[in-house]
């Protein structure tokens, strides 16, 4: 028999002792949490503030649920709450909730909101037009989304929004759904990811319920389908979505689609689907500029009731310049760090909080062409000569060096390297690599040459 507090203490102990997350992260996000109660198959856990609750749900939920299952041999849902709300969930004196055996199989009703996305009509309450920060990179996408929401199936149908991860595509889709619901409370809205659409379709085939599946998705007013690029390669699902699209479009129902790339760049997407995606309006969202990033941080701080100086916001905005989710996450981390170390939020605290999560600039990926150009410049020969069939000593030796570097500094296969050097056989590449490797053991001049070339390639 274990109660919620004991279970949660065990969970934290395992995570800390086995270093399943860095110590700094554990101290910042997990150490201050506490198990409050067991409600059926739901474990209620408190955290000191709402932004910590949000961070735990986004970053740690999977790890925590796996650890809970490992300890209890039960699949328990974790529901995070603010510490100030803990009294609402704490069991009354003598309540069995406080000492439920974790192997309890009897289901008990738990009045908690569902977190599952994809249910027809279910939308995220935070994703509305009023909370969307408009900037140069998303202004047109926002205007198009608002136009669609104001006049479904009359403005742009379909509306296709594309852009990188965390830039606001999903926010706009949910905002459209909320706006339509506000104007027409009886409207049937479906928000679904392409992955969930695929899974439901597969399940309907397995259970002989394809008719029910089709009725569900073809009798709605607005279809919001996220990450359509994941339909690539799924021929049967594409076939089903093609007919769903046609049915809705013919009935003058609104379709909104999001993707990480435009239709023409989605591989193995059927041409008939690609052409339909291009029937309406295609708009993109690009990473926010500095002013927009600061505005996003300011709006989040206001929503959370946080007093953050412009100096700190500027610092954070300068560190994260591509992804809105990471930007908001950075603010959350700074606030949590300041709270836990008991210091005011200033640029120094922000720098300390973010020092180990700043994106490290990836080294440029070296390709064979880079090596050919650098070697050619070093030996004063043209790349075309390096790749020619000529076997003069002035060409053969630099060519062998270039092949050696291609083998050492790229992930290309031997046949690929040979192909890039004038269609030579892979055995030629092996010979070149062995020859240069042998010379490097004792030839100081060769060692210096290779070092110089590697340095040039790295720069």
From Swiss-Prot:
Location of region: Domain IV, binds dsDNA: 339-459
UniProt-recorded Gene Ontology molecular function terms: ATP binding; ATP hydrolysis activity; DNA replication origin binding; lipid binding
SUPFAM superfamilies in the cross-refs: P-loop containing nucleoside triphosphate hydrolases (SSF52540), TrpR-like (SSF48295)
Keyword S-adenosyl-L-methionine among record annotations: no
S-S bonds: none
This protein's UniProt keywords: ATP-binding, Cytoplasm, DNA replication, DNA-binding, Lipid-binding, Nucleotide-binding
Region annotation (Domain I, interacts with DnaA modulators) ranges: 1-83
Name of the protein in its database record: Chromosomal replication initiator protein DnaA
Biological source species: Exiguobacterium sp. (strain ATCC BAA-1283 / AT1b)
UniProt gene name: dnaA
């Amino acid at each position: 028999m274990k109660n919620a507090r004991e279970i949660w203490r065990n969970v934290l102990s395992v995570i800390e002792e086995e270093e399943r997350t860095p110590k700094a992260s554990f101290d910042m996000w997990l150490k201050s949490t506490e198990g409050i109660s067991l409600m059926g198959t739901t474990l209620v856990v408190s955290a000191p503030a709402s932004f910590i609750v949000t961070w735990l749900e986004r970053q740690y939920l999977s790890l925590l649920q796996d650890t809970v299952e490992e300890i209890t041999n039960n699949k328990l849902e974790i529901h995070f709450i603010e510490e100030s709300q803990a009294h609402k969930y704490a069991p009354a004196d003598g309540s069995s909730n406080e000492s439920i055996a974790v192997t309890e199989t009897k289901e008990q009703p738990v009045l908690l909101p569902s977190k599952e996305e994809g249910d027809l009509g279910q939308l995220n309450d935070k994703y509305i037009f009023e909370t969307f920060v408009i900037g140069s990179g998303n202004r047109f996408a926002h205007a198009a989304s608002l136009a669609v929401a104001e006049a479904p199936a009359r403005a742009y149908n379909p509306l296709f929004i594309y852009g990188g991860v965390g830039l606001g595509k999903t926010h706009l889709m949910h905002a459209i759904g909320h706006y339509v619901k506000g104007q027409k409370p009886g409207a049937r809205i479906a928000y679904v990811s392409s992955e969930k659409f695929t899974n439901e379709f597969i399940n309907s085939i397995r259970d002989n319920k394809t008719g029910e599946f089709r009725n569900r998705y073809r009798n709605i007013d607005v279809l919001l389908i996220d990450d359509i690029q994941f339909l690539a390669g799924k021929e049967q699902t594409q076939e089903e979505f093609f007919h769903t699209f046609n049915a809705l479009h013919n009935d003058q129902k609104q379709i909104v689609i999001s993707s990480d790339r435009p239709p023409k760049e989605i591989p193995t997407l059927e041409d008939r689907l690609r052409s339909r995606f291009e029937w309406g309006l295609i708009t993109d969202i690009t990473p926010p500029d500095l002013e927009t990033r600061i505005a996003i941080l300011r709006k989040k701080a206001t929503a959370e009731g946080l007093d953050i100086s412009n100096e700190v916001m500027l610092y954070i905005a300068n560190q994260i310049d591509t992804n809105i989710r990471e930007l908001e996450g950075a603010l959350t981390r700074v606030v949590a760090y300041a709270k836990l170390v008991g210091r005011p939020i200033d640029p120094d605290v922000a720098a300390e909080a973010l020092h180990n999560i700043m994106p490290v600039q990836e080294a440029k990926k070296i390709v064979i062409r880079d090596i050919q150009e650098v070697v050619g410049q070093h030996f004063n020969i043209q790349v075309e000569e390096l790749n020619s069939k000529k076997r003069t000593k002035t060409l053969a030796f630099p060519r062998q060096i270039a092949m050696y570097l291609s083998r050492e500094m790229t992930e290309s296969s031997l046949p690929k390297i040979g192909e890039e050097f004038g269609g030579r056989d892979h055995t030629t590449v092996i010979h070149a690599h062995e020859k240069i490797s042998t010379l490097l053991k004792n030839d100081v001049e060769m060692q210096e040459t290779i070092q110089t070339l590697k340095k040039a390639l790295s720069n």
